[in-house]
Amino acid sequence: MRSAIILAAAVLTLSAQSELPPGILLLARVKAHTRAELKRLPNCSCLETVHREIKGARERLRPLDVVRLEVLYSDGKEMYAPPGDRRFAAEHPSAFAGGGMIGDGYFALYLSDLTGEGRVSYEYKGEEDVQGRRLARYDFRLPAMMSGQTIHMVEGTGTVGSTGSFWADPATYDIVRLEFHATEIPPFLPISESSHWVEYKRTKLGENEFLLPETASTRMVRLNGEESVNRMGFAQCHLYEAESSISFGMKEEIPGFATTAASDTELKPLQALLEITTRLSKPITLENAVGSLIEATVSGNVPRKGTVLIPDGSLVRGRVKRMEWNQEKGGYYIVGLEFREIDAAGVKYRFFADLQMLDRAPGVGFTLVFDTTQNRQVAGSTEILSLPEVPGVGTFFVRGRKLDLPKGFRMNWKTRPLLP
């Protein structure tokens, strides 16, 4: 009798499954599989390269800069550092880019939101051919009140909902592609559109394979018509161990990557108003992406109360904060350099200083002067461009398409009190 009851239950289960609308059973399996994949995702690190473009309301897209960061996925969170640095920070990646649009959440946040219980409404759209693969497509809607997605801007930070689609492999249940657009945008954020596309791929880490982002892109449009587009790639992914030194061993040559730096908690503060002259240890060119580590040396002893506080030749470490191309008025770059620490005979100091003077070099300066005369027979007028001060970041212009700050390029700095 017991076996008959079990058999009857099995028949009822099969009958119920056969009566489910198309795609329902597959959706349940895709969601369960994705949650299991996120749970088993180990601590790992990838090199993220971001090609950023911008345009005005009536312009074509033009390159802005290239940002390279190491992104560490650890215990459900994403952290960031310049390539080659071990000081991963849990702050938003915009802190490393010095302006412009940049995003996060590609490892787990979006997939976690998408497959959460009771959060999302789905609609099965059938199977489609995508790059030679037969994939099941689902449209979805995620309300802002259930979303973990936020948009960070100068005007503020707000939580948004999303609507979009994802494509899953019906055989492996892997989500292969994700596309979504922001909804319920808070009125204080001056944007009309924010869209994301992510491609996922099985990546071998150690002896196992995991589902990781391979490429992604974002597009944001402001209410005034200005548009920003980012195209991202993730490469050189590997398991991360807290005690190991990070080195990607990149196949392409990417200058400017430096050795491991100390954590901020290990750095001693420097008193304010010290005058320090530095010289670049290596040239800075267009090959140095935003986020790349840079090095310089102190030129001349820095005295303090009759003794040498920082000896000549001490190593100074930092990173490229900005490298933005602007094509107006003949074209120019905005360059921002942020030095963070000085190694003075084994004692590491926090370097927090304002740039006072630049070496003489063609087209390099704190301001740009343009002749705005329309008629050469009439006395001319000029337009002067300057840059806002950013504490701790030396920002300046380089006129023309060529950017080459040579080895030995001199910069004079004055230290300032650490911000509270």
Which role does the model predict for each range below?
Residues 155-165, 334-337, 400:
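Glycine-rich, flexible loop segments associated with nucleotide phosphate handling
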Residues 5-17:
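Hydrophobic h-region of N-terminal signal peptides that target proteins for export
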Residues 176, 265-420:
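Contiguous beta-sheet cores, especially beta-hairpins with glycine/small-residue-rich turns
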Residues 17-163, 170-176, 181-269, 420:
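Structured extracytoplasmic
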Residues 5, 96-98, 311-312:
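Short hydrophobic/aromatic-rich motifs at helix boundaries and adjacent loops
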